[in-house]
Amino acid sequence: MNVLISNDDGYLSEGIAVLARVTAEFANVRVVAPERDRSGVSNSLTLERPLQLKQAQNGFYYVNGTPTDCIHIGQSVFSDFQADFVFSGINRGANMGDDTLYSGTVAAATEAYLMGIPAVAFSLNDASGRYWATAEQALWTLLAHFFKTPPQSPILWNINIPAVAPEDVRGIKIARLGRRHHGQNVIPARNPRGEQIYWIGPVGEVSDREEGTDFGECGAGFITVTPLQIDLTAYPDMAETAAFWHAD
């Protein structure tokens, strides 16, 4: 069984090392990841320049592109390796609620799913680096169950691991996406030349962390698994939209 692994934090990140190390105990692994941090690039493709694929001393491959680029290259370049599954992560920081629309970690899994490959995105609800032991232990539990009876149908799962001590993880919950408030305004500044520049402001506060949401359950110490879908059609609004446009 072959697993292609990518992320958006780059091939040198601690999270992808943990994910590759644990997954290798269950399957054949190939890592194709961005050469640097590409957080927040969502499903973007590199179209304005050619891409290069290189191999690091640890055996990981890296690309001067986005996570989505990495999935395309990983599935196209290697004649000796075709993925049965794609794993993305482990992201340094959560990917919950609206974050999933921006996340390169989730995007790598999404791109694989669009190719017909079952895919899982993994994130740790912590950016401090204090809880990698929790992430690794959780991953052992998750993958032991996953590979015992691997999913047969196409899946796209978003998994978030709580920022608690390993012994304090309370189990697994299936959760829906929560919501954030609108992000904060851009921050104006001046560069050393006195020119006007702008920084994108911080993300908004969580507005929906009710029981059953990824924000709520992961914050309470549970590993959350959220099944995602690609179809963005608002089916309940179809009739109202047709009436507005006087269309069928």
From Swiss-Prot:
Gene name per UniProt: surE
Recorded GO CC terms: cytoplasm
Xref: InterPro entries: SurE, SurE-like_Pase/nucleotidase, SurE-like_sf
Native source species: Neisseria meningitidis serogroup C (strain 053442)
Gene Ontology MF terms in the entry: 3'-nucleotidase activity; 5'-nucleotidase activity; exopolyphosphatase activity; metal ion binding; nucleotide binding
Protein name, UniProt field: 5'-nucleotidase SurE
Principal location: cytoplasm
NCBIfam families xref list: PRK00346.1-3, PRK00346.1-4, surE
Pfam families: SurE
Cofactor note: Binds 1 divalent metal cation per subunit.
Catalytic activity: a ribonucleoside 5'-phosphate + H2O = a ribonucleoside + phosphate
Cofactor(s) of this protein: a divalent metal cation
Cell compartments where the protein resides: Cytoplasm
Enzyme Commission numbers on file: 3.1.3.5
Family recorded in the similarity comment: Belongs to the SurE nucleotidase family.
